[in-house]
């Protein structure tokens, strides 16, 4: 068994998560372990592996600003590449447009975890991306650096800054 998850394994895990989430939001009863067992029967991974992966999926939902399944608290140990894959699968399954919220947030978090780092170079002419309007593409290294310098406080008014999210790490909002 490879440590790396195949796209088929990730898609099956996200599909199971979305079904559980629908039941959770509708107030229907379900047993998470039944889903883990069904997945473990299909793929060469343990039920515990699928439980952890479901918590990674909760983390991606939280990064996207969406509600996750109670009892599957977000587990932040997921790389930005896998977070991006999970986000893409969620968006595809739900018919949503592609986004890179989870990948960017995960990259910021990874930069913040580095013990010693120099100020990032940044980009004096950042590229723009088209959405409903235009916005600059942010450098996750710069965002992480600024968040660390701010230390939870607004640089303009010195009040506690409003960029905290519920998973104990800041976001760039």
Can you annotate each of these PLM segments?
Residues 45-61:
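Major-groove recognition helix of helix-turn-helix-like DNA-binding domains
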Residues 1, 80-122:
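Defense-system signaling and execution modules centered on TIR/cGAS-STING-like, death/scaffold domains
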Residues 24-31, 164-170:
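Short helix/loop segment immediately N-terminal to the Walker
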Residues 4-30:
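Eukaryotic helical DNA- and histone-tail-recognition domains of regulatory proteins
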Residues 108-171:
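Short, charged surface segments at domain edges that flank catalytic/cofactor-binding sites
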Residues 62-81:
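Short Lys/Arg-enriched helix C-cap and helix-to-coil transition segments
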Residues 35-40:
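Short alpha-helical "recognition helix" segments of helix-turn-helix
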């Amino acid at each position: 068994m490879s440590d790396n998850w195949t796209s088929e394994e990730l898609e099956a895990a996200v599909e199971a998560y979305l079904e559980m989430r629908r039941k959770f939001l509708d107030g229907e009863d379900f047993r998470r372990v039944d889903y883990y067992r069904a997945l473990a029967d299909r793929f060469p991974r343990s039920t515990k592996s699928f439980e952890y992966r479901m918590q990674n999926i909760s983390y991606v939902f939280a990064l996207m600003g969406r509600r996750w399944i109670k009892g599957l608290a977000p587990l932040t140990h997921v790389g930005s590449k896998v977070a991006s894959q999970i986000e893409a699968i969620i968006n595809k399954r739900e018919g949503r447009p592609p986004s890179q919220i989870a990948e960017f947030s995960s990259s910021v978090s990874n930069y913040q975890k580095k013990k010693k780092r120099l100020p990032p170079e940044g980009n004096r002419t950042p590229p723009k991306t088209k959405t409903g309007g235009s916005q600059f593409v942010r450098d996750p290294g710069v965002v992480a650096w600024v968040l660390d310098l701010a230390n939870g406080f607004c640089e303009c008014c010195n009040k506690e800054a409003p960029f905290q999210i519920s998973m104990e790490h800041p976001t760039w909002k």
